[in-house]
Amino acid sequence: MTPHRVLLIEDDPLEAALAKRTLRQIDKTIDVIRLRDGAHFLEFYKKNRPVKGISLAIMDLHMPRIDGFGVLKVLQDNSERTPFPIIMFSSSEDKEEIENAYTMGAAAFVNKPVMPKAYRAALEHIVNFWLTTNRR
C-alpha cells in the first residue's frame, strides 16, 4: 500500500496525540505530520512549495496565532489552491462558520465529536472518503 502523508493542524497537544493515534489505528499507512497552528502550516507550506506527497490536511478551526479561517484567507488572497484537500475538523456547529469555511475553500467541514466512538467514526469517514474514494 502507498503511504498517505496527512497534515494535522491542531494546537492542543492532547487532541493532536488522540487524532494521530486514531488515524494510525484506522490506516497503518498514514504518516501524520502535526503542525501546531495556522501560522506553522503557512510556514510549512511556503518552505516546501511546491508541496508534494501530502494526501490531505485536517485542520482545527479555532487556534492561536492564525486560525483555520486565517489560513484559508491567506491561501484565497494569494489565489493559492493546495494540491491536497483541506478538511476543517472542528467542534463548532455554527452554520455561519461552516458556510464561511466552504466559501473560503475548505473541501469539507466535519464536526469533531467529544465521544470516543463518534470521534473515531468522524476520522474514519474522512479517511475513507478523502484517502480511498475521492483520491485526487
What are the residue ranges of the model-derived segments?
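Acidic, metal-coordinating helix/loop segments flanking the phosphotransfer/catalytic sites
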Residues: R34-L56, R120
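C-terminal output helix
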Residues: V114-I126
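Receiver (REC) domain active-site loop signature in two-component systems and cognate sites
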Residues: M63
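Conserved acidic segment of CheY-like receiver
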Residues: P3-L23
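A short, hydrophobic beta-strand element within the central beta-sheet of small alpha/beta folds
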Residues: P83-E93
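Active-site residues of response regulator receiver
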Residues: M59-D60, S90
